[in-house]
Amino acid sequence: MPQRKLGKTGAHRKAMFRNMLTDFFRHGRIETTLPKAKELRSLAEKMITTAKTNDLSSRRKVLKYVKDKEVVKKLFDEIAPRYSERPGGYTRILKMYPRRGDAAEKAIIELVEE
């Protein structure tokens, strides 16, 4: 699957998205740039779909991306069961005003409430 490069090396991009995923599941929403939000949406949707099966293999797959065990517990015990009947579309991206310094498009990505 092609990824957005976002002007970063592979290791930097991977670390950035790991941190963003962890914060996203911890807080339920984060504010970032639009391209990062679009890429994060793809990863978050896959993590929630994986967490819905709730077995050891799924937990290990999610632990590859989300390094905080408390956040993984929250994902499996609170977030995934909330979307058990929903086939997809767990997140929403809301566009915001451009950033003042460099006019980068900003966005809020958040979990959809059932």
From Swiss-Prot:
Q: Which Gene3D superfamilies match?
A: Ribosomal protein L17 (3.90.1030.10)
**GO cellular component terms attached to this protein's record:** cytosolic large ribosomal subunit
The keyword Ribonucleoprotein is annotated on this UniProt entry: yes
Show the InterPro entries listed in the entry. Answer: Ribosomal_bL17, Ribosomal_bL17_CS, Ribosomal_bL17_sf
For molecular function, the Gene Ontology terms on record are: structural constituent of ribosome
Ordered alphabetically, the record's keywords are: Ribonucleoprotein, Ribosomal protein
What is the protein's quaternary organization?
Part of the 50S ribosomal subunit. Contacts protein L32.
For this protein, the record's PANTHER family field holds: LARGE RIBOSOMAL SUBUNIT PROTEIN BL17M (PTHR14413:SF16), RIBOSOMAL PROTEIN L17 (PTHR14413)
UniProt lists the family membership as follows: Belongs to the bacterial ribosomal protein bL17 family.
Protein name, per record: Large ribosomal subunit protein bL17
The organism that produces this protein has a lineage beginning with: Bacteria, Bacillati, Bacillota, Clostridia, Halanaerobiales
- The protein's gene is named rplQ
